[in-house]
Amino acid sequence: MKMKTIIRQVVLGAAVLAVAGCASYRWTSGVPKEMRTVCVPTFRNETDITELGNVTARQILREFQREGTFRVARQDDAAVEVQGVLKSQNTEYVGGDRRTGMRYGVHNLTVKAVVSVIDRRNGKVLVNNREYTAMGSFTTGQDVATHRRDASGRVAEDLATKIVDDVLRMKW
């Protein structure tokens, strides 16, 4: 075989593999245009972290705005509604260092939630009670409750990212 023929076959094979790898890629969103408005009511909060339901809903709305596919709308004007319940939270002591003369500890905060996505145009449940877990860590001195509340904002951000990513990847 001639060298030119071999080079052509290699280039052709590489092109076929490249096209096959990109076959499912889209330059535009897979979300239908008529579904690109969203509302997120305050999540029901069954944890003992004050205001976590409000903070989580706000973070989800911010994540939708940051991502840009959906426009945030009032509940009456939205095509999609994301509903959720914050089911539980757990604060776990991870460790600390007493050598500094100051007592402090490192803790992990884990929050579990269930989320549903509703098509408000016809009432169809698109996602029914999908479970999510979000986690964040924090360092404390004497006041664990205050530091846990501060960490809950970061946990809400983590939860928001996971939920919005899943909504964007849904089969519409």
What are the residue ranges of the model-derived segments?
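Sec-dependent bacterial lipoprotein signal peptides
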Residues: 1-22
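Short alpha-helical segments used as structural interaction elements across diverse proteins
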Residues: 5, 33, 145-146
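A generic short-segment signal for beta-strand/edge and adjacent turn/coil regions
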Residues: 8-9, 41, 49-55, 78-86, ...
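A structural "domain/chain start" motif
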Residues: 21-62, 66-77, 121, 131, ...
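Surface-exposed short loop/turn segments
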Residues: 26, 67-71, 77, 81-126, ...
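Soluble non-cytosolic domains of exported or imported proteins
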Residues: 46-58, 104, 108, 146-158
